[in-house]
From Swiss-Prot:
It comes from Klebsiella pneumoniae (strain 342). The lineage of its organism: Bacteria, Pseudomonadati, Pseudomonadota, Gammaproteobacteria, Enterobacterales. Its EC number is 2.5.1.16. The active site is at residue 158. Homodimer or homotetramer. This is Polyamine aminopropyltransferase. It is found in: Cytoplasm. Belongs to the spermidine/spermine synthase family. GO terms for biological process: spermidine biosynthetic process. It comes from the Bacteria. GO terms for cellular component: cytosol. Pfam families: Spermine_synt_N, Spermine_synth. One of its GO terms (molecular function) is spermidine synthase activity. Residues 5-238 form the PABS domain. It catalyses: S-adenosyl 3-(methylsulfanyl)propylamine + putrescine = S-methyl-5'-thioadenosine + spermidine + H(+).
Length: 286
């Protein structure tokens, strides 16, 4: 490792992580962004944007399995799914494993992201872009959810952190648009950062989402790349019962879907909705 340069993440002040860089595959630094993809011996291929790790080959499966199978199996009868972002294709890969889904729409603001990730992160999409149920829409996510005539059973917001371009996907305008195009009984989920370090983000999302949905909460997963504690995923629906389904129901749906996962299982599904007390306290604070 001493012979390899080190790449340091810059997400948090006074605290962080680094990766040794075995080989830089791509690096573009402009006035608008700093994008790098490199190989790391421990985590495989790593993609970082503006000094923040977005995904790695080693542990991406945890994030993407939890962002897809939790809402889809909780819903139980999703036919039309919307993915906001997700240009690396891994979210599409996991959604497409549910054969009962009829349409998968993905909204990505930059067409170049998709072609770029297909070239440099082919294992993420694993051929899912060729699924005949899939439609790619090049548009801003906020604009799409507020203008589309389509409706969806599950909406997955695969957003970056709420800084720079990703900030719009944490706004009331976005959440209102998602409610607008979500079918009755539908589920909205979104990544919401590591709550121990980014607690204000969770509190802000909870407050805004509560204006549009009757049941707003979070679920969690431990993802090594997103260090600092558990990662939280926002959950919003008008049907609170979907968050409290019995393990027997989830097990039956999991079996029917014929899924084989590396992180997700029905027990993880149920346990994921148990949140630490400090988050409960923050969400209930006046």
């Amino acid at each position: 490792m001493a012979d390899n340069p080190l790449w340091h993440e810059t997400l948090h002040d006074h605290f962080g992580q680094y990766f040794s860089v075995d080989n830089v595959l791509y690096h573009e630094k402009t006035d608008h962004q700093d994008l790098i993809i490199f190989d790391n011996r421990a985590f495989g291929r790593v993609m970082a944007l503006d000094g923040v790790v977005q995904t790695t080959e080693r542990d991406e499966f945890i994030y993407h399995e939890m962002m897809t199978h939790v809402p889809l199996l909780a819903h139980g009868n999703a036919k039309h799914v919307l993915i906001i972002g997700g240009g690396d294709g891994a979210m599409l890969r996991e959604v497409s494993r549910h054969r009962s889904i009829e349409t998968i729409t993905m909204v990505e603001i930059d067409a170049g992201v998709v072609s770029f990730c297909r070239q440099y992160l082919p294992n993420h999409s694993a051929g899912a872009y060729d699924d005949p149920r899939f439609t790619l829409v090049i548009d801003d996510g906020v604009n799409f959810v507020n203008q589309t005539t389509q409706t969806f059973d599950v909406i997955i917001s695969d957003c970056t952190d709420p800084i720079g371009p990703g900030e719009s996907l944490f706004t009331s305008a976005f959440y209102e648009g998602c409610k607008r195009c979500l079918n009755p009984g539908g589920v909205f989920v979104a990544q919401n950062g590591v709550c121990f370090l980014q607690q204000d983000e969770a509190v802000g999302s909870h407050r805004k989402l509560s204006h549009y949905f009757r049941d707003v909460s979070f679920y969690q997963a431990a993802i090594p790349t997103y260090y600092g504690g558990i990662m939280t995923f926002a959950w919003a629906s008008d049907n609170e019962a979907l968050r409290h389904l019995s393990s027997e129901i989830i097990q039956a749906r999991f079996h029917k879907a014929n899924l084989t996962c590396r992180y997700y299982n029905p027990a993880i599904h149920t346990a994921a909705f148990a949140l630490p007390q400090y988050l409960h306290d923050a969400l209930s604070a006046p």
